[in-house]
């Protein structure tokens, strides 16, 4: 009998697909997205797709087991391009009303130019969009 997460020798192990997507004008968020993607590559049994939010297709989104979204901070919020990405989930990709992202893992990261630039608020708005689509958002815990 196999335990959770174990695969028998005669079954091919399926890779966990992680979509890392972002918007970046200055290049800072892009560099952070690349670092996140490199981190995913370091985890055995995963594959990563790194794309700007405007280039993500419905197939990219729906085939992912986890979605990590990065944004620069604009007025203590996600960028307009990242907001449009989430709007496209419903209006372009047809995520709702079937909740096609339900139980997929979600995560966020943000870049800001100042110590108190609103990165926490921007990440919370990204995570709120994910939670509204019944995704699973997990925190590492600890002090921030």
What are these regions (language model features)?
Residues 2-4, 13-15, 57, 139-144:
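Glycine-rich phosphate/pyrophosphate-binding loop and the adjoining helix
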Residues 54-142:
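Helix-loop-strand module that forms the ligand-binding subsite of alpha/beta enzymes
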